[in-house]
Amino acid sequence: MTLFHFGNCFALAYFPYFITYKCSGLSEYNAFWRCVQAGATYLCVQLCKMLFLATFFPTWEGAAGAYDFIGEFMKATVDLADLLGLHLVMSRNAGKGEYKIMVAAMGWATAELVMSRCLPLWVGARGIEFDWKYIQMSIDSNISLVHYMAVAALVWMWTRYDLPTHYRLPVTVLLGLSMYKAFLMDCFVHMFIMGSWTALLLKAVITGVLSLSCLTLFVSLVHGN
Protein backbone atom coordinates (compact mmCIF):
# COMPACT_ATOMS: atom_id res chain seq x y z
CA MET A 1 0.00 0.00 0.00
CA THR A 2 2.80 2.43 0.84
CA LEU A 3 4.54 1.71 -2.47
CA PHE A 4 1.23 2.22 -4.28
CA HIS A 5 0.76 5.57 -2.54
CA PHE A 6 4.29 6.62 -3.47
CA GLY A 7 3.66 5.59 -7.08
CA ASN A 8 0.51 7.70 -7.22
CA CYS A 9 2.27 10.74 -5.77
CA PHE A 10 5.24 10.26 -8.09
CA ALA A 11 3.01 9.95 -11.16
CA LEU A 12 0.94 12.97 -10.16
CA ALA A 13 4.07 15.07 -9.67
CA TYR A 14 6.28 13.96 -12.57
CA PHE A 15 4.07 12.71 -15.41
CA PRO A 16 2.65 16.17 -16.28
CA TYR A 17 6.24 17.34 -16.84
CA PHE A 18 6.95 14.38 -19.10
CA ILE A 19 3.71 14.87 -21.03
CA THR A 20 4.39 18.59 -21.43
CA TYR A 21 7.90 17.89 -22.72
CA LYS A 22 6.64 15.36 -25.26
CA CYS A 23 3.55 17.22 -26.43
CA SER A 24 5.16 20.66 -26.65
CA GLY A 25 7.53 19.52 -29.39
CA LEU A 26 10.69 20.03 -27.35
CA SER A 27 11.66 16.40 -27.89
CA GLU A 28 11.65 17.02 -31.66
CA TYR A 29 14.19 19.82 -31.23
CA ASN A 30 16.51 17.66 -29.10
CA ALA A 31 16.11 20.21 -26.34
CA PHE A 32 16.87 17.82 -23.48
CA TRP A 33 20.35 19.17 -22.78
CA ARG A 34 19.08 22.72 -23.12
CA CYS A 35 16.61 21.93 -20.35
CA VAL A 36 19.43 20.41 -18.29
CA GLN A 37 21.44 23.61 -18.71
CA ALA A 38 18.41 25.62 -17.59
CA GLY A 39 18.18 23.37 -14.53
CA ALA A 40 21.86 23.94 -13.77
CA THR A 41 21.27 27.68 -14.00
CA TYR A 42 18.41 27.26 -11.53
CA LEU A 43 20.78 25.60 -9.05
CA CYS A 44 23.33 28.40 -9.36
CA VAL A 45 20.66 31.06 -8.88
CA GLN A 46 19.22 29.35 -5.81
CA LEU A 47 22.71 29.03 -4.30
CA CYS A 48 23.33 32.75 -4.81
CA LYS A 49 19.93 33.56 -3.31
CA MET A 50 20.61 31.43 -0.23
CA LEU A 51 23.99 33.07 0.31
CA PHE A 52 22.45 36.53 -0.09
CA LEU A 53 19.57 35.77 2.28
CA ALA A 54 21.86 34.23 4.89
CA THR A 55 24.11 37.28 4.77
CA PHE A 56 21.62 40.15 4.68
CA PHE A 57 18.40 38.62 6.03
CA PRO A 58 19.18 36.45 9.06
CA THR A 59 16.38 34.55 10.77
CA TRP A 60 13.94 36.93 12.42
CA GLU A 61 13.28 36.22 16.06
CA GLY A 62 9.94 37.71 17.07
CA ALA A 63 6.94 36.83 19.16
CA ALA A 64 5.50 33.37 18.76
CA GLY A 65 3.06 33.27 15.85
CA ALA A 66 4.04 36.76 14.66
CA TYR A 67 4.61 37.35 10.97
CA ASP A 68 7.34 39.69 9.79
CA PHE A 69 5.63 41.30 6.79
CA ILE A 70 8.45 43.71 5.97
CA GLY A 71 11.15 41.07 6.32
CA GLU A 72 9.26 38.57 4.18
CA PHE A 73 8.58 41.26 1.58
CA MET A 74 12.28 42.03 1.36
CA LYS A 75 13.08 38.33 1.06
CA ALA A 76 10.50 37.97 -1.72
CA THR A 77 12.24 40.77 -3.58
CA VAL A 78 15.29 38.51 -3.87
CA ASP A 79 13.20 36.38 -6.25
CA LEU A 80 14.13 38.96 -8.86
CA ALA A 81 17.16 36.71 -9.35
CA ASP A 82 14.84 34.05 -10.78
CA LEU A 83 13.67 36.47 -13.45
CA LEU A 84 17.27 37.31 -14.30
CA GLY A 85 18.13 33.62 -14.43
CA LEU A 86 15.25 32.86 -16.79
CA HIS A 87 16.32 35.75 -19.02
CA LEU A 88 19.89 34.40 -19.05
CA VAL A 89 18.67 30.95 -20.09
CA MET A 90 16.49 32.32 -22.89
CA SER A 91 19.16 34.70 -24.16
CA ARG A 92 21.58 31.78 -24.59
CA ASN A 93 19.13 29.76 -26.70
CA ALA A 94 18.52 30.47 -30.36
CA GLY A 95 15.14 29.91 -31.93
CA LYS A 96 11.57 31.09 -31.75
CA GLY A 97 10.16 32.70 -28.65
CA GLU A 98 7.93 29.71 -27.90
CA TYR A 99 10.95 27.41 -27.95
CA LYS A 100 12.96 29.65 -25.62
CA ILE A 101 10.06 29.95 -23.19
CA MET A 102 9.39 26.22 -23.04
CA VAL A 103 13.06 25.30 -22.59
CA ALA A 104 13.55 27.81 -19.78
CA ALA A 105 10.28 26.94 -18.03
CA MET A 106 10.71 23.16 -18.30
CA GLY A 107 14.31 23.22 -17.10
CA TRP A 108 13.57 25.64 -14.26
CA ALA A 109 10.42 23.89 -13.02
CA THR A 110 11.93 20.41 -13.32
CA ALA A 111 15.01 21.42 -11.35
CA GLU A 112 12.79 22.86 -8.61
CA LEU A 113 10.71 19.68 -8.61
CA VAL A 114 13.75 17.43 -8.24
CA MET A 115 15.47 19.54 -5.61
CA SER A 116 12.49 20.41 -3.43
CA ARG A 117 10.04 17.52 -3.77
CA CYS A 118 11.88 14.37 -4.83
CA LEU A 119 13.38 13.53 -1.44
CA PRO A 120 10.24 14.39 0.63
CA LEU A 121 8.14 12.19 -1.65
CA TRP A 122 10.62 9.33 -1.51
CA VAL A 123 10.92 9.45 2.28
CA GLY A 124 7.44 10.57 3.29
CA ALA A 125 5.10 9.01 0.73
CA ARG A 126 6.56 5.57 1.48
CA GLY A 127 5.71 5.88 5.16
CA ILE A 128 3.32 3.57 6.95
CA GLU A 129 0.70 6.24 7.61
CA PHE A 130 -1.16 7.95 4.76
CA ASP A 131 -0.85 11.74 4.68
CA TRP A 132 -2.62 14.12 2.31
CA LYS A 133 0.30 16.54 2.30
CA TYR A 134 2.16 14.43 -0.25
CA ILE A 135 -0.80 14.56 -2.63
CA GLN A 136 -0.88 18.31 -2.07
CA MET A 137 2.85 18.49 -2.75
CA SER A 138 2.37 16.66 -6.05
CA ILE A 139 -0.47 18.94 -7.11
CA ASP A 140 1.60 21.96 -6.13
CA SER A 141 4.37 20.82 -8.46
CA ASN A 142 1.93 21.01 -11.39
CA ILE A 143 0.92 24.52 -10.34
CA SER A 144 4.61 25.47 -10.28
CA LEU A 145 5.05 24.23 -13.85
CA VAL A 146 2.24 26.49 -15.07
CA HIS A 147 3.63 29.35 -13.01
CA TYR A 148 7.11 29.14 -14.52
CA MET A 149 5.72 28.92 -18.05
CA ALA A 150 3.83 32.15 -17.45
CA VAL A 151 6.84 33.83 -15.83
CA ALA A 152 9.17 32.79 -18.65
CA ALA A 153 6.71 34.17 -21.20
CA LEU A 154 6.46 37.45 -19.29
CA VAL A 155 10.24 37.76 -19.08
CA TRP A 156 10.54 37.06 -22.81
CA MET A 157 7.93 39.71 -23.64
CA TRP A 158 9.40 42.30 -21.27
CA THR A 159 12.91 41.95 -22.72
CA ARG A 160 11.80 42.33 -26.35
CA TYR A 161 13.24 45.48 -27.86
CA ASP A 162 10.17 45.88 -30.09
CA LEU A 163 7.58 45.47 -27.32
CA PRO A 164 4.80 48.02 -27.98
CA THR A 165 4.50 50.75 -25.37
CA HIS A 166 0.95 49.81 -24.37
CA TYR A 167 2.15 46.29 -23.49
CA ARG A 168 4.87 47.49 -21.15
CA LEU A 169 2.64 48.34 -18.16
CA PRO A 170 0.53 45.14 -18.05
CA VAL A 171 3.59 42.94 -18.56
CA THR A 172 5.44 44.76 -15.77
CA VAL A 173 2.46 44.46 -13.42
CA LEU A 174 2.12 40.73 -14.11
CA LEU A 175 5.85 40.26 -13.56
CA GLY A 176 5.59 42.00 -10.20
CA LEU A 177 2.61 39.88 -9.19
CA SER A 178 4.42 36.70 -10.21
CA MET A 179 7.49 37.68 -8.21
CA TYR A 180 5.52 38.49 -5.05
CA LYS A 181 2.91 35.76 -5.44
CA ALA A 182 4.39 33.55 -2.71
CA PHE A 183 4.58 36.51 -0.33
CA LEU A 184 0.97 37.49 -1.00
CA MET A 185 -0.09 33.88 -0.49
CA ASP A 186 1.67 33.72 2.87
CA CYS A 187 -0.03 36.96 3.92
CA PHE A 188 -3.47 35.63 3.01
CA VAL A 189 -2.86 32.33 4.77
CA HIS A 190 -1.60 34.09 7.89
CA MET A 191 -4.36 36.71 8.03
CA PHE A 192 -7.29 34.41 7.26
CA ILE A 193 -5.85 31.24 8.89
CA MET A 194 -6.47 29.11 5.81
CA GLY A 195 -6.22 25.36 5.75
CA SER A 196 -3.78 23.55 3.50
CA TRP A 197 -6.38 22.63 0.86
CA THR A 198 -7.84 26.15 0.80
CA ALA A 199 -4.37 27.64 0.43
CA LEU A 200 -3.59 25.22 -2.41
CA LEU A 201 -6.86 26.12 -4.15
CA LEU A 202 -6.13 29.82 -3.78
CA LYS A 203 -2.65 29.31 -5.22
CA ALA A 204 -4.11 27.41 -8.18
CA VAL A 205 -6.66 30.16 -8.85
CA ILE A 206 -4.10 32.96 -8.64
CA THR A 207 -1.69 31.05 -10.88
CA GLY A 208 -4.48 30.32 -13.34
CA VAL A 209 -5.53 33.97 -13.56
CA LEU A 210 -1.91 35.07 -13.94
CA SER A 211 -1.26 32.47 -16.65
CA LEU A 212 -4.43 33.27 -18.63
CA SER A 213 -3.59 36.97 -18.52
CA CYS A 214 -0.07 36.21 -19.72
CA LEU A 215 -1.39 33.94 -22.49
CA THR A 216 -3.75 36.67 -23.69
CA LEU A 217 -0.90 39.18 -23.91
CA PHE A 218 1.44 36.68 -25.56
CA VAL A 219 -1.05 35.62 -28.24
CA SER A 220 -2.05 39.19 -29.05
CA LEU A 221 1.61 40.24 -29.22
CA VAL A 222 2.72 37.36 -31.45
CA HIS A 223 -0.24 37.56 -33.83
CA GLY A 224 -0.14 41.35 -33.78
CA ASN A 225 3.36 41.24 -35.21
Swiss-Prot record:
Record bears the keyword Nucleotide-binding: no
One Gene Ontology biological process: multi-pass transmembrane protein insertion into ER membrane
UniProt record similarity statement: Belongs to the TMEM147 family.
Topological domain ranges for the Lumenal compartment: 59-68, 127-131, 190-196
Main location: endoplasmic reticulum
Keyword Transmembrane: yes
Record note on quaternary structure: Component of the multi-pass translocon (MPT) complex.
Compartment annotation: Endoplasmic reticulum membrane; Cell membrane
Keywords: Cell membrane, Endoplasmic reticulum, Membrane, Transmembrane, Transmembrane helix
Cytoplasmic side stretches: 22-34, 91-100, 158-166, 219-225
Single annotated GO MF: ribosome binding
Membrane topology term: Multi-pass membrane protein
The protein's name: BOS complex subunit TMEM147
Name of a matching Pfam family: DUF2053
Cellular component, GO annotation: endoplasmic reticulum membrane; nuclear membrane; plasma membrane
UniProt cross-references to InterPro entries, sorted A to Z: TMEM147 (IPR019164)
